[in-house]
Design a protein with these regions (language model features):
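Alpha-helical segment proximal to the catalytic Tyr-Lys
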Residues: 133, 182-183
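A glycine/serine/threonine-rich, flexible loop-to-helix segment
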Residues: 162, 186, 198-220
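Active-site loop-to-helix junction immediately N-terminal to the catalytic Tyr of the SDR YXXXK motif
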Residues: 108, 158-167, 179, 207
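Substrate-binding pocket helix/loop in short-chain dehydrogenase/reductase
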Residues: 104-105, 109-117, 204, 212-216
Length: 220
């Protein structure tokens, strides 16, 4: 079954934060393969630019890199302003950029708490706030604009690792999604979240080459 047999996203515009690797890259590739222009962000400019060119060439579709640090309000405003200067409206906002921090309870640092909460929760809220007008521009009752927040299974269950701020942040993402969904549905903007489980990615760090058999047993 092809996506275009279910719905058509040809010539639409998407914003994917953290779009240069992991789940963000997969989402970006899916949009590009189906004719959507995509803006992607990441902190590391060279890798972001290289990935955008790679994806653009592969799918023969525009993938525009905007390097920025979305953990700060300055970074959020620079990112949103740049897209506002290029587009009258957007159809999709994928709040994917995130961070994790692992440390024993007894020594868990304020920096490890704030870094994760700022990027995983604060930036998600303010990006949605600042992109609202662009989402409204393209939204209609027949074809709503959409916000997709990337949560985590660790926001629903008790995490197996000592990633206290990460699990807490993702629980906040899931509840904030409900709150935003109830507010924005009245304006033809649909807000949803997904809750991925563990998979090999740069965020897992040393766990990328981990034996996933035990984790798989706990996955229903």
């Amino acid at each position: 079954m092809k996506i275009d047999s279910l719905f058509n996203i040809q010539d639409k515009v998407a914003v994917v934060t953290g779009g240069s690797r992991g789940i963000g890259e997969m989402i970006t590739a899916g949009f590009l393969a189906n004719g959507t222009k995509v803006y992607i962000s990441a902190r590391k400019a060279p890798a972001l630019v290289d990935k955008a060119k790679e994806l653009s060439d592969k799918y023969n579709q525009e993938c525009i890199p905007i390097p920025c640090d979305l953990s700060s309000m300055n970074g959020i405003e620079e990112f949103t302003n740049e897209i506002q200067n290029k587009e009258k409206g957007i159809d999709f906002l994928i709040n994917n950029a995130g961070a994790a921090w692992g440390e024993p309870l007894e020594s868990f640092s304020e920096g490890g708490w704030d870094k994760v909460m700022d990027l995983n929760v604060k930036s998600l809220f303010f990006l949605t706030q600042k992109f609202k007008n662009l989402l409204l521009h393209n939204a209609s009752e027949e074809d709503p604009s959409r916000v997709i927040n990337i949560g985590s299974i660790d926001g629903l269950n008790v995490p197996s690792m000592e990633t206290y701020s990460y699990g807490t942040s993702k629980a906040a993402v899931h509840h904030l999604t409900r709150v935003l969904a109830a507010k924005l549905v009245k304006e033809n903007i649909l807000v949803n979240a997904i809750a991925p489980g563990p998979y090999p990615s740069a965020m897992l760090g040393s766990a990328v080459n981990h034996d996933y058999s035990e984790i798989a047993k706990r996955n229903p």
